[in-house]
């Protein structure tokens, strides 16, 4: 019998035991932002290997690990599960784009050190609301030029859909916490166009 594929996991959140708020997308997203570094610091080696072992016992043979910080790469590489390791890139500020790209390149190079038939370094553009077009262009170009697998979060909620289509709604209010005059970087069509041919 073939193994299952879990194409989108976040092992960096393996330590989550009720820290994140579920239900409303924006409340959940706020709890992720507030807790992600703490959860990532708590999710190391043994805990990640335990979570992978639990997935394998349930019949999962391949995962798509979405990695913000890269700390779970070694555990994934040692676990025996086939891992497409999506190094995530994001950043809404044009002024910080070069720094975000540099940090991504460093993490991506670290993940390449584990490359094997069971560990495939890949790219993830976080989302259209959190990733400046300059960063998206960099990531999609890297994927094209190196024939890398790429992923993204897209249209995960009605809030995001309204934001991308009309530039208004609760997402605009939420994004105003980070930018006093938020405006969408993309329409749904223009975001998808970045991934053409991938």
Segments the model singles out, each with a brief description of its role:
Residues 1-4, 9, 56, 61-62:
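N-terminal capping/lid subdomain adjacent to the active-site entrance of alpha/beta enzymes
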Residues 2, 37-38, 125:
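Proline-centered helix-kink/hinge sites
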Residues 3-14, 149-158:
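Histidine-centered catalytic micro-motifs
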Residues 9, 66-67, 85-89, 125-127, ...:
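A cross-domain feature marking catalytic cores of carbohydrate-active enzymes
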Residues 15-46, 84-92, 157-198:
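Active-site gating loops and adjacent loop-to-helix segments of metal-dependent hydrolytic enzymes
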Residues 17-81, 102-116:
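Alpha-helical scaffold segments that flank or form the walls of functional sites
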Residues 71-75, 100-198:
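Histidine/acidic residue-rich metal-binding segments in metalloenzymes
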Residues 93-100:
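Short, charged, surface-exposed secondary-structure boundary motifs
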């Amino acid at each position: 019998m073939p193994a299952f594929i879990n194409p989108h996991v976040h092992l960096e959140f393996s330590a989550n035991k009720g820290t994140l708020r579920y239900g409303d997308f924006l409340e959940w997203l706020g709890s992720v932002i507030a807790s992600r570094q703490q959860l990532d610091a708590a999710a190391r080696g043994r805990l990640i290997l335990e979570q992978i072992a639990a997935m394998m016992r349930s019949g999962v043979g391949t995962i798509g690990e979405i990695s913000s910080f890269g700390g779970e790469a070694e555990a994934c590489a040692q676990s025996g599960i086939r891992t497409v390791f999506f190094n995530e890139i994001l950043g809404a500020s044009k002024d910080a784009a070069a720094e975000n790209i540099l940090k991504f390149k460093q993490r991506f190079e670290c993940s390449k050190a584990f490359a094997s038939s069971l560990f495939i370094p890949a790219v993830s553009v976080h989302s259209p609301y959190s990733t400046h077009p300059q960063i998206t262009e960099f990531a999609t170009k890297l994927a094209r030029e190196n024939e890398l697998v790429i992923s993204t979060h897209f249209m995960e909620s009605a809030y995001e859909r309204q934001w991308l289509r009309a530039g208004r709604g609760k997402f605009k209010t939420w994004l105003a916490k980070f930018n006093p005059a938020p405006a969408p970087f993309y329409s749904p069509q223009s975001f998808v166009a970045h991934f053409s041919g991938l």
